[in-house]
Amino acid sequence: MSTWIFLRGLTRESGHWGAFTAQFESALPGCEVVALDLPGNGSLCHQASPLRVPDMVEHCRAELDRRWLPPPYHLLGMSLGAMVAVAWSAAHPDEVAAQVLINTSLRPFSPFYQRLRPRNYGLLLRLALLGADPEDWERSILRITSRGGQDAVLPQWLALRAQHPVTRANALRQLLAAARYRAPKVMTIPTLLLASGQDQLVSVACSQALARQWQCRLQVHPTAGHDLPLDDG
């Protein structure tokens, strides 16, 4: 049996995978999916988010050890979660069998304006610094991360937000950790990159640059948005 560790992105939690985890397990018989929350998100919303991506890795490793789930692991990470996967693979390659990275962006391979599209600066700053009505917040995030008209998930997202509220301080801490992280120039772990051609948050050029740097496989979905598992899981 293979163990797949799912890692979500900025301010998102394991619940945001929705039905994708069950679909994944059905598609790959014999695999076990473990969706982890990063500190500050989900069931860990009362913890302070680490300011360094490697510290997020160590939290995940400790949690899996606590659950008696030994390596090797297959990692599937999206956005910030993909950065955690990369840092994990670089620091502990003996623990990682392979990794799938979805719509991620990494220093030093991509400029800031590709890692976060400028059209979103104003909205994200307003949400992070000034806050917003919960429905306005989640609807705004859905609008910039999905291209599939997935309004049906909004009530679920609002319920997750009410149950596990992410503080503005933790949102900023996660954003800072993501901005500061520098990826290795060489990757020895088998890696598959998945990118969305209609990603409105992160340019597909980031995954293309990473594929060139690491000489790894890249698959581009032509119509999905940033939240690829939501749009076409």
Regions found by a protein language model. Give the residues of each.
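Conserved HGGG/HGGXW glycine-rich cap/lid loop of the alpha/beta-hydrolase fold
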Residues: 1-46
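Active-site loop/oxyanion-hole signature of alpha/beta-hydrolase fold enzymes
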Residues: 32-76
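Gly/Ala-rich beta-loop-alpha elbow adjacent to hydrolase catalytic centers
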Residues: 77-81, 85
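Flexible "cap/lid" loop of the alpha/beta hydrolase fold
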Residues: 90, 98-128
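Conserved alpha/beta-hydrolase catalytic His-Asp/Glu region
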Residues: 132-185
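Short beta-strand/loop motif that positions the catalytic acidic residue
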Residues: 187, 193-195, 199
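Conserved alpha/beta-hydrolase "acid-adjacent" motif
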Residues: 200-206
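Catalytic histidine-centered segment of alpha/beta-hydrolase-like enzymes
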Residues: 224-233
